[in-house]
Amino acid sequence: MRLCGFEAGLDKPLFLIAGPCVIESEELALETAGYLKEMCSQLNIPFIYKSSFDKANRSSISSYRGPGFEKGLSILEKVKSQIGVPVLTDVHEDTPLFEVSSVVDVLQTPAFLCRQTNFIQKVAAMNKPVNIKKGQFLAPWEMKHVIAKAKAQGNEQIMACERGVSFGYNNLVSDMRSLVIMRETGCPVVYDATHSVQLPGGNNGVSGGQREFIPALARAAVAVGISGLFMETHPDPDKALSDGPNSWPLDKMKQLLESLKAADEVYKKYSTDF
């Protein structure tokens, strides 16, 4: 699949979608995007910047949701024009899709909305690349039906994203078999290594997380075989306004990506999956 100027697929080099969970400020967005662009250029990893202008599914009414549509979209436009990177953001049922599509390069649908047929089809009808997150409640083989709804709009630029599955209350686990199963859709499969260590709503009205397990799960996913890696990162995760406990420190990204790139190259050299 052609994606933001590069080829994405199981037999292609690993690409990265990364950035802070939510837009906190223009300064932070430009800083992180610039840092990640330079890092990925050095490592020769295709890169898409991500951040959200509105986190509509925060656990608490008092949690920070973002700068809002107009200001957030303006910041994403500056990231794209000033830093020179493609950008991804998530959209919701009440998002003005035409306005967002005029700025961003990739649309993302939240995991909680993956079963909303009208929503999935409206997003796919924008004819932009779409990263569809698999719901925490959904079996991997059910994603073929979600993908079919999107592709019924004539859009073949669809990705399937694994972000963990509910395991009891306030806990997620990653079943690596799901990556293999979702590849059967024919779409590039993306692994979200940061939300997969989230402890949803498990910290007194806010989500906790176990970021120490991010490297292990990311390496496992790359070894199984994926097209892209999704990671939320922040210069100071403990002070992040959203999803800090499951965000990876920005200054540790390069070391981790170096190991993942090496693992990806080994998998794609010796794999019999394609």
Curated annotation (Swiss-Prot):
InterPro entries in UniProt: Aldolase_TIM (IPR013785), DAHP1/KDSA (IPR006218), KDO8P_synthase (IPR006269)
Pfam families per UniProt: DAHP_synth_1
Key words of the record: Cytoplasm, Lipopolysaccharide biosynthesis, Transferase
GO biological process, one term: keto-3-deoxy-D-manno-octulosonic acid biosynthetic process
GO molecular function, one term: 3-deoxy-8-phosphooctulonate synthase activity
EC numbers, comma separated: 2.5.1.55
Principal EC category: transferase
Catalytic activity line of the entry: D-arabinose 5-phosphate + phosphoenolpyruvate + H2O = 3-deoxy-alpha-D-manno-2-octulosonate-8-phosphate + phosphate
Major subcellular location class: cytoplasm
Gene3D superfamilies: Aldolase class I
Subcellular location: Cytoplasm
SUPFAM superfamilies, A to Z: Aldolase (SSF51569)
Domain of life: Bacteria
Cellular component GO terms held in the UniProt record: cytoplasm
Metabolic or biological pathway, per its Swiss-Prot or TrEMBL entry: Carbohydrate biosynthesis; 3-deoxy-D-manno-octulosonate biosynthesis; 3-deoxy-D-manno-octulosonate from D-ribulose 5-phosphate: step 2/3; Bacterial outer membrane biogenesis; lipopolysaccharide biosynthesis
Family: Belongs to the KdsA family.
NCBIfam families, per the entry: KDO8P_synth, PRK05198.1
Protein name: 2-dehydro-3-deoxyphosphooctonate aldolase
Gene source species: Legionella pneumophila subsp. pneumophila (strain Philadelphia 1 / ATCC 33152 / DSM 7513)
Gene name for this UniProt entry: kdsA
